[in-house]
């Protein structure tokens, strides 16, 4: 009943659902009544138009998830959920909130499904969208400079071990970074990837683990535990080239451009690992075990290079 019998010839009525209604009017005159009816079509209060994703979908970079709603959106709440690999991995980007957008930072490459729940009291409407997230590529051209790598190293406050490397072809950090670029470019690997991995593996060239500076092993090649010192190389360039070749082996099945100096390259070949990790994030659990965030940690250092 929109209005009980009243002297007022009008009233307000608030429909709660979309659809076709029949409205009945009774005009009462004592014991006599007259009647009218009218069909009223009520549209939806709001409509969920789309789930939009803005920004580059890259590992470690925030993207914006936005619910597009037309009509009266007052009182609505929005929940965003993501999953990858058939719910093998999933998470909540935003719990139910009045905000129709949120930021989500994917941590791994691959195809994700993003779920949007638009909540209106006890009612919900849903949308899904596939999002392909690109990782941090290992192969590629130089995207920074020797100066930028040197500046980052010096900003950390670490002292470059000149005494260790002066006889190995890299008396200064600038020489070291120049050799990184030379070795990396020769095999088509991004120099900043090599720099960042070397800094992560050696603690900014301070070492301290089973690998010693005079081994010129900047990526822990062959150092499978704390007791094993791993591979040994004649000079800094050879050690960096071995690291570059191991990265290339993981990233692509393409042949090496130089004579192989990586003692572990044949392991990648024999186990069918060539080309299984085109992105840094794919190295998780491969180069380092368990290494759940190994690639992300390298990418984080890359992001610090100016």
Regions found by a protein language model. Name each.
Residues 61-69:
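A short beta-strand segment in extracellular, disulfide-stabilized domains
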Residues 2-7, 91-98:
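Short beta-strand segments within Ig-like beta-sandwich modules, predominantly Fibronectin type-III
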Residues 30, 70-74, 121:
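Short glycine/proline-centered coil/turn motifs in the loop regions
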Residues 45-53:
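Proline-enriched interdomain boundary motifs that mark the N-terminal boundary
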Residues 135-306:
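Catalytic cores of secreted/periplasmic lytic hydrolases that degrade extracellular macromolecules
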Residues 13-17, 84, 104-108:
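Residue-level recognition of secondary-structure-to-loop junctions
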Residues 55-61:
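Short, solvent-exposed loop/linker segments at the N-terminal edge
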């Amino acid at each position: 009943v929109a209005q009980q019998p009243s002297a007022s010839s009008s009233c307000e009525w608030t429909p709660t659902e979309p659809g076709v209604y029949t409205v009945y009017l009774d005009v009462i005159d004592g014991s006599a009544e007259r009647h009218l009816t009218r069909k009223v079509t009520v549209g939806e209060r709001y409509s969920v138009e789309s789930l939009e994703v803005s920004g580059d979908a890259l590992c470690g970079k925030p993207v914006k998830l936005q619910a597009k709603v037309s009509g009266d959106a007052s009182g609505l709440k929005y929940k965003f959920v993501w999953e990858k690999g058939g719910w093998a991995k999933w998470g909540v980007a935003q719990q139910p909130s009045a905000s129709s957008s949120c930021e989500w930072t994917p941590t791994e490459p691959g195809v994700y499904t993003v779920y949007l729940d638009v909540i209106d009291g006890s009612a919900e409407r849903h949308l899904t969208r596939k999002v392909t997230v690109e990782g941090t590529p290992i192969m590629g051209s130089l995207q920074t400079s020797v100066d930028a790598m040197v500046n980052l190293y010096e900003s950390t406050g670490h002292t470059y071990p000149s005494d260790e490397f002066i006889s190995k072809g890299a008396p200064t950090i600038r020489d070291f970074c120049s050799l990184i670029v030379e070795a990396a470019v020769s095999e088509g690997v991004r120099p900043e990837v090599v720099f960042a991995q070397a800094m992560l593996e050696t603690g900014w060239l301070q070492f301290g683990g089973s690998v010693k500076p005079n081994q010129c092993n900047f990526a822990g090649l062959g150092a499978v535990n704390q007791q094993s010192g791993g591979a040994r190389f004649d000079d800094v360039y050879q050690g960096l080239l071995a690291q570059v070749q191991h990265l290339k082996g993981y990233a692509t099945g393409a042949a090496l451009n130089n004579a192989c100096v990586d003692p572990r390259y044949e392991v990648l070949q024999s186990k069918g690992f060539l080309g299984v990790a085109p992105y840094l994030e794919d190295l998780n659990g491969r180069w380092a075990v368990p290494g759940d965030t190994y690639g992300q940690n390298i990418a984080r250092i890359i992001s610090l290079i100016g």
